[in-house]
A protein has these predicted regions:
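Class I S-adenosyl-L-methionine
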Residues: 7-8, 20, 139-142, 146-195
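Rossmann-like AdoMet
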Residues: 1-81, 85-129, 133-134, 138
Length: 195
């Protein structure tokens, strides 16, 4: 299903730049990897530190408590980007709720998640939380972001240099109607940060 979406995009655009390819493959609403599958956990494709041990989340919670005490913060946003099944935040919240005096310090819990299965699970586990898809939707107050393995899944642009010529990685359809890597002239904006 996702291959068909990618082929159609490649046919209409000649090539798919790597960042567009990754965005479609990961985030397509109908068949994207992170939007339609359950990739995390024993029955998924990978596990993350919070799935193995609660100590990772507990250490993060202790650092949060240290920081808000140091800065005398009484209200803050706690936002997790790409929380998956919510394992990390369960560990963090458990420690925060045990050690923060709710009469003095309050936090608003938010998630930035695109997977429909995980969104439903998060709503069940954290009924007082909010799930957002725009960064402008958060309260304007002290904010702590948690992003365990979130950036690993973001689309990237890849530039290579061969014989003093820059190329940008893309995907195209070959003569056998298969998707294959290609190295093409970079988009102008892709070269802006290269000296």
């Amino acid at each position: 299903m996702i291959k068909q979406t990618l082929r159609e995009f490649a046919r209409s655009n000649k090539t798919i730049f790597l960042d567009d390819f990754m965005k479609i493959a990961h985030q397509d609403k109908k068949s994207g990897y992170y939007t339609t599958k359950k990739p995390i956990g024993k029955n998924g494709d990978f596990i993350t530190a919070p799935e193995v041990s609660q100590i990772f989340g507990e250490i993060i919670a202790i650092k949060i408590i240290e920081k808000i005490n140091q800065l005398n913060v009484t209200q803050f946003n706690l936002i997790e980007l790409g929380p998956g099944r919510g394992s990390l935040m369960m560990d963090i919240v458990r420690v925060l709720d045990n050690f923060l005096d709710k009469n003095i310090v309050n936090y608003s819990l938010y998630f930035h998640e695109i997977n429909k299965f995980y969104i439903n699970k998060l709503k069940t586990i954290f009924p007082d939380s909010q799930i957002k898809d725009e960064f402008s939707d958060y309260r304007n107050q002290y904010t702590i972001f948690i992003a365990n393995e979130f950036f690993d899944a973001l689309p990237i642009r890849q530039i290579t240099k061969r014989n003093d010529i820059f190329f940008e990685t893309a995907v195209k359809i070959n003569e056998k109607n298969k998707l294959e890597l290609s190295y093409v002239e970079p988009r102008k904006e892709s070269l802006e940060y290269i000296n």
